From Swiss-Prot:
Family annotation (SUPFAM superfamilies): RL5-like (SSF55282)
One GO cellular component term: ribonucleoprotein complex
Summary of the function given for this chain in its UniProt record: This is one of the proteins that bind and probably mediate the attachment of the 5S RNA into the large ribosomal subunit, where it forms part of the central protuberance. In the 70S ribosome it contacts protein S13 of the 30S subunit (bridge B1b), connecting the 2 subunits; this bridge is implicated in subunit movement. Contacts the P site tRNA; the 5S rRNA and some of its associated proteins might help stabilize positioning of ribosome-bound tRNAs.
Keywords associated with the record: Ribonucleoprotein, Ribosomal protein, RNA-binding, rRNA-binding, tRNA-binding
Record has Ribonucleoprotein as a keyword: yes
Assembly: Part of the 50S ribosomal subunit; part of the 5S rRNA/L5/L18/L25 subcomplex. Contacts the 5S rRNA and the P site tRNA. Forms a bridge to the 30S subunit in the 70S ribosome.
Protein name: Large ribosomal subunit protein uL5
Superkingdom of source: Bacteria
GO process annotations (BP): translation
The species this protein was found in: Actinobacillus succinogenes (strain ATCC 55618 / DSM 22257 / CCUG 43843 / 130Z)
UniProt family annotation: Belongs to the universal ribosomal protein uL5 family.
């Protein structure tokens, strides 16, 4: 079992229960899922770029990504409905906790010119979204084999009712918010 999951059960639940005066342990917010999304718009011209993006995301997450397709045709971008334009992975359970631990302890500190993550990236319902400009911050990616530096979106979905609870949950895991 992941260390952060044990830490959540043993420490964070009690901390948040007293802080927000919850009647039941089940009211305490928890991380539901983590979604990784990589948009590969250049895949229209070169299909190999999408395959490389899928391989990168599979290495980062530990599971096979789903290839996302365009929902509608947009003439300005020269895409048609059904064209593959990206890939995504939804992590839950054990893999989610392991990824979250690697994200906080290894990947985020390796971001170039890192001064902390913005606390304004909450969506109003306690979910946190962040963008990563380079996939090479993850140790699973071999820097020499990277064909192109790609970014990805990371969304942490929680059961928190509002941003304050969501921020308290992530801060309890020492999430590196900007001061």
């Amino acid at each position: 079992m992941a260390k952060l999951h044990d830490y959540y059960r043993d420490q964070v639940v009690n901390e948040l229960k007293t802080k927000f005066n919850y009647a039941s342990v089940m009211q305490v917010p928890r991380i539901e899922k983590i979604t990784l999304n990589m948009g590969v718009g250049e895949a229209l011209t070169d299909k190999k770029l999408l395959d490389n993006a899928v391989a990168d995301l599979a290495a980062i997450s530990g599971q096979k990504p789903l290839i996302t397709k365009a929902r509608k045709s947009v003439a300005g971008f020269k895409i048609r409905q059904g064209y593959p334009i990206g890939c995504k992975v939804t992590l839950r359970g054990e893999r989610m906790w392991e990824f979250f631990e690697r994200l906080i302890t290894i990947a985020v500190p390796r971001i170039r010119d890192f001064r902390g993550l913005s606390a304004k990236s909450f969506d109003g319902r306690g979910n946190y979204s962040m963008g990563v400009r380079e996939q090479i911050i993850f140790p699973e990616i071999d820097y020499d084999k990277v064909d192109r530096v790609r970014g990805l979106d990371i969304t942490i979905t929680t059961t928190a009712k509002n941003d304050e609870e969501g921020q308290a949950l992530l801060a309890a895991f020492n999430f590196p918010f900007r001061k």
